Amino acid sequence: MVTPEVRSQIDTGSGPVGAAWIRPRGAVATLVVAHGAGTGMDHPFMAGFARAIAEHGVATLRFNFPYIERGRRSPDPEGVLRATWLAAFEDARSRSDGRPVLAGGKSLGGRIASMAVADGMPAAGLVFLGYPFHAPGKPERVRDEHLYRITVPMLFIQGTADPFARPEVVRKVLRKLGRAAEHVPVEGGDHSFNVRGHKRDAREVGESVAELAAPFVRRVAGAG
């Protein structure tokens, strides 16, 4: 039986934003997952990811940042993004019946989650679906300082051809993070996990990435 998706809203302090729950029966954990800079929570990648990871007993809460709700292209100021993340996390925690709540997201969504956790948001773990370590063409300017303040388990799913994550940069950061971090490379994958010569739609890509994330989430929840 397919678990239904339930729509809701979250009050963020900058106005309500849309949200979507998928809660499979007997879920072992909740993963709050945020979209990347150029897409909203209903992008096929996000929807496919949430639907597929539910098959592994993981509930998900997806949500929009305010700029997406308003039809804008440019992301909100960092303070608004972080406040939205905190509101979404608290909403998830209040509805998870004591289950572990993890945080994560695609690119921007995952980066803001990591900043919130570094500053105290009590997630049980972090799942990065293409972490943006640096701007394309600027691997010398790595955005990693706050990662070393994080004490919960982290999973980095990264395409090896991602212009935001040169493999040598990823390896260096992971060495410094030590056992707190796990790395799952997607061979030939770009920032959207597309692999040249292997055409798939975004929903299928999201589903395949969920298969990589699910074992980590279940393990953090003590159900792996």
Q: Where is each model-derived feature located?
A:
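Serine-hydrolase catalytic machinery in alpha/beta-hydrolase-like enzymes
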Residues: S8-V101, F193-D201
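Short alpha-helix in the alpha/beta-hydrolase fold that links the catalytic acid
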Residues: M46, R143, V152, A165-L174
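Primarily recognizes the serine-hydrolase "nucleophile elbow" in alpha/beta-hydrolase
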Residues: W85-I150
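Short beta-strand/loop motif that positions the catalytic acidic residue
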Residues: R149-T151, F156-Q158, D162, V186
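Acidic catalytic loop of the alpha/beta-hydrolase fold
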Residues: T160-A165, H191-S192
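Catalytic histidine neighborhood in serine/cysteine hydrolases
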Residues: K176-N194
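Catalytic active-site module of serine/aspartate enzymes centered on a nucleophile-bearing elbow/loop
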Residues: G189, G197-G224
